[in-house]
Each structure stands twice: as structure tokens, then as C-alpha cells.
């Protein structure tokens, strides 16, 4: 049988509430859509979204309109991932596991620099 060793997480939480998805990211490096959504929502709720977006590179995104037509847009990768998560009916876009993790890291870093928890 193997041994289980307890340790501590040195990275501080960035959200002002306990979230299992944040613990999983910090402890095990698990990038989840739940954590991405929570970080995105926190940035929006704090009124930081415009400032965050202004610092991010833009990527192509194909928007699906209600009438079934599409249009090309340039949005942040974070917003692209958010749209893909929230609009599964739009199958014109995709993201990788690495892109999800990178987006989470960018949001965590942004929150750290703007937060006073």
C-alpha cells in the first residue's frame, strides 16, 4: 500500500470565498470550467472586466446569431472560452486544456494585482 502525505498549498486563494474548484486548481493543477466561470464572474462583479480585457490579446471568435448566421469577432481568449462554455450550441469554436489553464492563470494574476482580500 502507498503512503499519503499531507502538505500545504503555498499559493494564496484569489477568490474571497472557498471554492472546491480553486482548491483543486491550486493543489492538483486541475483547470475546470467551474473555476474559469467563477474567476470570470468575479472580475465582472468587481467592475474590472474592461480593464482586464484591455490588457489581453484578442483572438478570433465566430459568433452564432439567433437566425443561424455567423460573424467573425476579435475577443479575448478568456471571453472566447467563457462563450464556448455558456453557448454549447455554437460549435464553430474550440479551446484546448492548455488554453483553459492559461486563461485561469491570467485571471488569477489580474485579480491578485487588483485585490485587497
Predicted features, each with a name:
Residues 29, 84, 88-91, 106-113:
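Amphipathic alpha-helical interaction surfaces
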Residues 19, 95-96:
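A diffuse structural propensity rather than consistent per-protein peaks
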Amino acid at each position: 500500500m502507498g503512503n499519503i502525505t499531507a502538505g500545504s498549498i503555498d499559493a494564496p486563494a484569489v477568490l474571497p470565498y472557498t471554492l472546491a474548484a480553486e482548491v483543486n486548481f491550486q493543489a492538483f493543477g486541475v483547470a475546470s470550467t467551474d473555476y474559469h466561470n467563477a474567476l470570470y464572474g468575479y472580475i465582472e462583479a468587481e467592475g474590472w472586466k474592461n480593464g482586464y480585457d484591455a490588457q489581453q490579446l484578442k483572438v478570433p471568435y465566430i459568433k452564432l446569431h439567433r437566425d443561424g448566421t455567423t460573424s467573425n469577432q476579435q475577443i479575448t481568449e478568456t471571453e472566447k472560452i467563457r462563450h464556448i462554455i455558456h453557448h454549447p450550441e455554437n460549435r464553430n469554436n474550440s479551446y484546448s486544456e492548455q488554453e483553459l489553464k492559461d486563461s485561469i492563470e491570467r485571471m488569477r494574476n489580474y485579480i491578485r494585482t487588483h485585490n485587497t482580500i
